[in-house]
A protein has these predicted regions:
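Short beta-strand/loop motif that positions the catalytic acidic residue
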Residues: 194, 200-202
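Acidic catalytic loop of the alpha/beta-hydrolase fold
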Residues: 205-209, 234
Length: 269
């Protein structure tokens, strides 16, 4: 089967916008059921088959961060971005919801839950980029190594594409300002008080955020489960869409009673 025989990832989603936090915020939405607010990586929304699968059971809302569109965002830190996300959630009439974040979005989700835990039913962190011991800055990688760090299966849809230079020039200073060096003693002190159920996922072959950082996140979050995904790099959704969607959907539906136990594990093919 060729790519032309397969529907495009995200084909079930509808693009909308909402006025919130002083911005016109673009988002994509599909599905019915309990709401899942998804915070994507630093490159903005990338639609995947995993999101399509989750939308079969949940109302999935994929945000484009304020400042990732035409309007600039001078937010100073992740706490400020989390406050903007909270305003967007309110504008979308989301009182309580599941929160899912990828890489940069995972870092934002950690800050969000320390301030708005009463709004979050559960958290899913895909390759979260908050703690980055022995990790790699993408800008230091040659093109072939860059692809390998993100994807174990770059042949699978969606294919990786080169970042748009104009987008990078506009957005990347904000990303670097918020990310810093990944350390945050203040956040650690707050995370230890968070009881929200949390699923932490790392691709075993992640070449951007070293998977050892999953243990750091788990150590700070007392009600969490850490799972390593076999045959996946940084972008788990694209490398293993079925496995990602299955384990996330089960976790969102059943919490810590989901199909994998609460010990560190490995999701096999």
């Amino acid at each position: 089967m060729t790519d032309t025989d397969v529907r495009a990832p995200g084909s079930t989603f509808v693009e909308r916008s909402v006025e919130a936090a002083g911005f016109t915020v673009r988002y994509l939405e599909a599905g019915d059921g309990p709401a899942v607010l998804y915070l994507p990586g630093a490159g903005g929304p990338v639609m995947t088959f995993a999101l399509d699968s989750l939308a079969e059971r949940f109302r999935v809302i994929v945000l484009e961060y304020p400042g990732w569109g035409a309007q600039p965002n001078d937010v100073a830190d992740f706490d400020g971005l989390a406050a903007q996300v909270a305003d967007i959630a309110t504008a979308l009439r989301l009182d309580r919801f599941h929160l899912m974040g990828t890489s940069f979005g995972g870092a934002c989700a950690l800050h969000f839950v320390t301030h708005y835990a009463d709004r979050v039913d559960s958290i899913v962190l895909e390759s979260p980029a908050k703690f980055r011991e022995s990790s790699v800055h993408p800008s230091t990688l040659a093109p072939e190594a860059f692809v390998k760090a993100f994807r174990s299966h770059p042949d699978r849809l969606p294919h990786m594409s080169s970042p748009d230079p104009a987008f990078m020039a506009r957005v990347w200073p904000t990303v670097e300002r918020l990310m810093g060096d990944g350390s945050d003693d203040g956040l650690v002190e707050q995370l230890v008080d968070v009881s929200t159920r949390t699923l932490i996922l790392f691709g075993r072959d992640d070449g951007i955020i070293n998977p050892i950082n999953g243990r750091t996140v788990r150590r700070y979050m007392r009600n969490s489960s850490l799972q390593y995904v076999y045959d996946a790099a940084h972008d788990i959704q694209s490398d293993r869409p079925e496995a990602f969607a299955d384990v996330v959907a089960d976790f969102l539906a059943r919490g810590m009673n989901f199909l994998i136990n609460d010990q560190d594990g490995l999701i096999n093919p």
